[in-house]
Amino acid sequence: MMKSFFLVVTILALTLPFLGAQEQNQEQPIRCEKDERFFSDKIAKYIPIQYVLSRYPSYGLNYYQQKPVALINNQFLPYPYYAKPAAVRSPAQILQWQVLSNTVPAKSCQAQPTTMARHPHPHLSFMAIPPKKNQDKTEIPTINTIASGEPTSTPTTEAVESTVATLEDSPEVIESPPEINTVQVTSTAV
């Protein structure tokens, strides 16, 4: 509440001198003779033409074309040409774009034919790439994907070496090499 009160007081304090000055100027009547307009050099100063041209660009010379940025294939702008798409297919398969007519035939209920901008849409077949047809087809073997009831086992043979060294409680040095036995082990991997 106090903030709004101080705000109002501040605004009044700033605007009262200006309001008093306007009332004093209104007390002096302006007398114009012969329907001449009152013109004061202090109020309307000379405005150079460079200021107007730089301030308002619509009056200035247009060195650049000021067009809005839009896509070439925008369906809402009446361009007679469409850009060719990026080559995602071979050049023989890319459609040839042509200049399309810009008129629409009149409807039967209208007395005279109307000319309207027609916005052609490009054929979208260039976006889909058809599957390649291979001339030399190779035979792909068919695999039976149905699981059988019994898992198949693959026999593998591994060589296992076992070293047997006999230590006795005697202080004699063993001069014979340890015995090496090779055993064939067959396992079934599932």
UniProtKB/Swiss-Prot annotation:
Q: Which GO terms describe its biological process?
A: lactation; protein stabilization; response to 11-deoxycorticosterone; response to dehydroepiandrosterone; response to estradiol; response to progesterone
The protein's location, in the record's own words, is:
Secreted
At what positions is Phosphothreonine found? T166
Q: So which residues have sugars stuck on them?
A: T142, T152, S153, T154, T157, T163, S170, T186
Give UniProt keywords alphabetically: Disulfide bond, Glycoprotein, Milk protein, Phosphoprotein, Pyrrolidone carboxylic acid, Secreted, Signal
Q: Could you say which tissues express the protein in this record? A: Mammary gland specific. Secreted in milk.
Cite the GO molecular-function annotations of the record: identical protein binding; zymogen binding
Q: Which residues carry this modification: Phosphoserine?
A: S148, S170, S187
Task: List site positions: Cleavage.
Answer: F126, M127
Q: Which cysteines are joined by disulfide bonds?
A: C32-C109
User: What family name appears in the similarity comment?
Assistant: Belongs to the kappa-casein family.
PANTHER family per UniProt: KAPPA CASEIN, KAPPA-CASEIN
Summarizing the function annotation, the protein's role is: Kappa-casein stabilizes micelle formation, preventing casein precipitation in milk.
Q: How does it assemble?
A: Monomer or homomultimer; disulfide-linked.
Q: What else is known?
A: The sequence shown is the A variant.
Q: What is this protein called?
A: Kappa-casein
Q: Which organism is it from?
A: Bos taurus
